[in-house]
């Protein structure tokens, strides 16, 4: 290649120069960097903010010739050191800098990784894309890579180049759509974005890195180059135990938590991840929770979205600290015997212009047609699960959380909206699949791939589906035609139970089926029984405020609700604040009302929750056969007039507990309950206990069998059944 000073008008060099100076150069290495020349090598650099540039050669620093007033410099000769170093001076400011030329370095991404990425099978795309601190030919710097197949030009911009898209244009890997650039000598923690020019419209977009692992604190949204901090994990024992964990038969009691509103400093500041660990872990242990589930902590711009509109699928939100601080939080949870589950949102993403939306000027991560790609309820875009690179992106996001942060499970949000093309859409607002149906075939394939990957790559890790329809086999293996989730939230149980509990007790006998219907389908899936954040927002009222009656009855009903939940078949999840008996809905901008614990009724709710949790954890009959019909049997589900139900929960060794629940405010003395043998019984739990601020009606001492058959059982006992309360009984000799 000839130097610009000797090129003829209209030459390719003139064209490349024009494209560079107007930020339209598709292939920067065709113009910048090292090229063959008659006298050895031609080095060409673009430094628009420098007055003079020298090239380090075997003969020392040699001045480069200015060939364009906008900052193009050339040097031609022999003895070039590789990779070559530049010394640059801005004579106006007196600033002198030394750094290597990015265009002296080859691209590093392998063709194999690009192939897998384009095939939708690269499970660790976060190693390929994004910003990475690497060494290239002995020089330390940052390698940037981004997928933008419809771009004419992509540049890395930041404070380090005055956000000038002409300075660091990236190089593209053939037809893969992946752009790459190694910038040597770039400091750790530098803020950056990608400037993208669409090749059709010429639109210029400024986008944050979809694969970044750290972003600026909101409201800013630039990505940060990685800071080398290798975390020293100390949870080897936990991970080893998890691999062999028999979760089907184990207790699983989840505390659902929003990091920013559990507790705050007196001045309203968030707890950091370290501070959260200091306060939360002892609380979880004391209260008897086995796991904590965090509402989404991937980076998101809006507090009020609760994290469900993510813009950083590989980044812990900077609101509460660094990635290393979150690793420490998870590590400390594991060392304390607490598992950590994350809410993860592959169903949709926000319209924010700095993020995924129309990333390269086209519908890249979403569908072009809003009938497929836009969610009217949430004002968000829907991922295009049929696009392989989007599949690699989402699978890699899940892999990253489980690998980098040792997460124990993912709760997948809004699964129903993924499965149905006509979800929350009217006629004419959706497009059928290739068979004319309403099933989203690509989303089904993605979910199966996700679950297969999680269970295969991370033994013992769990996946939970928040799926609100009757879609079959959600928690059955993908190889058997299911979606492959470990468990599914039982939204039917939740809706029926809360509907029943909100009826005035005098009318509950007309809605008795809302208590009993669940047993018709309770074992068709591996169910979790949720009393989640979604039920205490948007005018639905707090759990306490949902309950009918006067003040005492509200608390009694709430105690009864929690007793029913903890004794029903299925794993458990409760949202933070439920255990306090909060009087108003969850407010994301405030901490929980901890001051309520100064009052007896609220202390009673917390004490009941604590005792129920520990009873559940330590009683095999209450958890071993949650997913199996042999773990439950009715004693009496027909006492409609008195709104009482009774049932047994069974363990694998044949032991059992007897549960009797009274959903009316009537104290029932002399209430007869059928029993399966002739043992005496004793009360092991009573939600009406004085310790829970109840009326303290109950059953002291042994309860002897009467010898009278009852409710299809060979014998029976007579008990006192407290008002709006539940009792749990065990055989006195068991």
UniProtKB/Swiss-Prot annotation:
Which positions are catalytic residues? Answer: 413, 466
GO terms of biological process kind = glycogen biosynthetic process
Q: In which pathway does it act?
A: Glycan biosynthesis; glycogen biosynthesis
GO CC terms: cytosol
InterPro entries in UniProt: A-amylase/branching_C (IPR006048), Branching_enzy (IPR037439), GlgB (IPR006407), GlgB_N (IPR054169), GlgB_N_E_set_prok (IPR044143), Glyco_hydro_13_cat_dom (IPR006047), Glyco_hydro_13_N (IPR004193), Glyco_hydro_b (IPR013780)
Q: List the disulfide bonds.
A: none
Q: Which reaction does it catalyse?
A: Transfers a segment of a (1->4)-alpha-D-glucan chain to a primary hydroxy group in a similar glucan chain
Matching entries from Pfam families are given as: Alpha-amylase, Alpha-amylase_C, CBM_48, GlgB_N
EC class of this enzyme? transferase
EC number, UniProt record: 2.4.1.18
Q: Which GO terms describe its molecular function?
A: 1,4-alpha-glucan branching enzyme activity; cation binding; hydrolase activity, hydrolyzing O-glycosyl compounds
**What keywords does the record list, in alphabetical order?**
Carbohydrate metabolism, Glycogen biosynthesis, Glycogen metabolism, Glycosyltransferase, Transferase
The function of this protein is: Catalyzes the formation of the alpha-1,6-glucosidic linkages in glycogen by scission of a 1,4-alpha-linked oligosaccharide from growing alpha-1,4-glucan chains and the subsequent attachment of the oligosaccharide to the alpha-1,6 position.
> What is known about its subunit structure?
Monomer.
Q: Which family does it belong to?
A: Belongs to the glycosyl hydrolase 13 family. GlgB subfamily.
Q: Which PANTHER family match?
A: 1,4-ALPHA-GLUCAN-BRANCHING ENZYME (PTHR43651:SF3)
- The protein depicted here goes by the name 1,4-alpha-glucan branching enzyme GlgB
